[in-house]
A protein has these predicted regions:
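Generic detector of well-ordered alpha-helical segments enriched in charged/polar residues
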Residues: 5, 9, 67-71, 103
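Extended catalytic/binding region for NAD+/ADP-ribose chemistry, centered on the ART fold
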Residues: 44-80
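Glycine-centered flexibility motif
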Residues: 6, 57, 129-132
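Short acidic, low-complexity intrinsically disordered linear motifs used
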Residues: 1-16
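Active-site and NAD+-binding cores of ADP-ribose-processing enzymes
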Residues: 19-47, 74-164
Length: 164
């Protein structure tokens, strides 16, 4: 985990992916925090009771997607945050970057939830050695076709194991 900038809000230029002179590239994975982020806690995943339950862990955005979403949808969150961090993933992250990957994820880890809606078994993914999931770029079509993905607002990932 690398602190990119502290108290960066005052340097935020609207409608740009450049913050305080630092350009957030599409390859970077970033998250913001109200307080200094000092330690990662592993999170035990559970099989969700319904599709809208996302995995638990440290969430990050791919490129400037999360920051851009916050600007328009939750500007208060952005205003309250003072720290921007870059995440480096070295471990076993399940990566979804296209329709074929998406179908494979649903085939391998999808299960029928209540009312016939499909969920993803985050617990099984963890048991099989994955320390997180990343879906980049964002897939708008899948959002409307897959109930479990509907709550994901941007290209993002979630890490639940510190070795990742």
């Amino acid at each position: 985990m690398k602190l990119l900038f502290e108290n960066w809000r005052k340097f935020l230029i609207k409608e740009q992916s450049e913050l305080w002179g630092h350009h957030i590239t599409p390859e970077q994975k970033v998250f913001i925090s109200k307080t200094p982020y000092t330690e990662f806690r592993n999170v035990q995943q559970k099989k969700p009771p319904h599709p809208m339950i996302k995995p638990q862990g440290l969430w990050y955005g791919c490129g400037d997607a999360w920051v851009a979403w916050l600007r328009t949808e939750q500007p208060d969150w952005l205003e309250e945050s003072s720290y921007l961090y870059e995440v480096k993933t070295d471990g076993k992250i399940y990566k979804v970057s296209n329709d074929a990957d998406f179908e494979e994820l649903e085939f391998d880890y999808g299960f029928g939830g209540r009312y016939g809606n499909q969920s993803i078994d985050w617990e099984l993914m963890q048991k099989e050695g994955y320390g997180g999931i990343e879906i980049c770029p964002y897939n708008w079509q899948r959002r409307t076709d897959s109930d479990w993905y509907y709550g994901w607002d941007v290209a993002s990932g979630c890490i639940w194991d510190s070795s990742s």
